[in-house]
Amino acid sequence: MRKIYATGKRKTAIAKVWLTPGKGELSINEQSLNQWLGGHEAIKMKVMQPLLLTKQEQSVDIKAVVFGGGYSAQAEALRHGISKALNAYDIVFRAILKPKGLLTRDSRVVERKKYGKRKARRSPQFSKR
């Protein structure tokens, strides 16, 4: 029985994912998917997307530890980690996951604040007179 490890990232969220052949159990931070999400269906679909595309939702067990960021970033980090683990599990899945962009790290992060400005781009109010 192989145990595959993969890491997914999004913004400041990091997901450590362990994938094993099994019967479709999902454990996120030692909770079920529904307990962890609290009933957010859109975020649940985001997490399940790589499993549904590869039709592996009933044939692999996933144990994940997710930290940092908010719920949406954590869900996308988890999706990235699951996709990378499925790719390592069977190379055939690459042809399914790659065109959907699930193996690509989303590199968009918060822009840093610059001096002389109120935020990253917001300037102080300008008065002509």
Curated annotation (Swiss-Prot):
Its recorded name reads Small ribosomal subunit protein uS9
Q: What is the lineage of its organism?
A: Bacteria, Pseudomonadati, Campylobacterota, Epsilonproteobacteria, Campylobacterales
The answer to whether the entry has keyword Ribonucleoprotein is yes
Q: Would you tell me the Gene Ontology cellular component terms?
A: cytosolic small ribosomal subunit
Species this protein is from: Helicobacter acinonychis (strain Sheeba)
Q: Please tell me whether the keyword Repressor is annotated for this protein.
A: no
Q: Which terms does the UniProt entry file under GO BP?
A: translation
GO MF terms, alphabetically ordered: RNA binding; structural constituent of ribosome
Entry-linked SUPFAM superfamilies: Ribosomal protein S5 domain 2-like
The UniProt keywords, alphabetically, are: Ribonucleoprotein, Ribosomal protein
Record-stated family = Belongs to the universal ribosomal protein uS9 family.
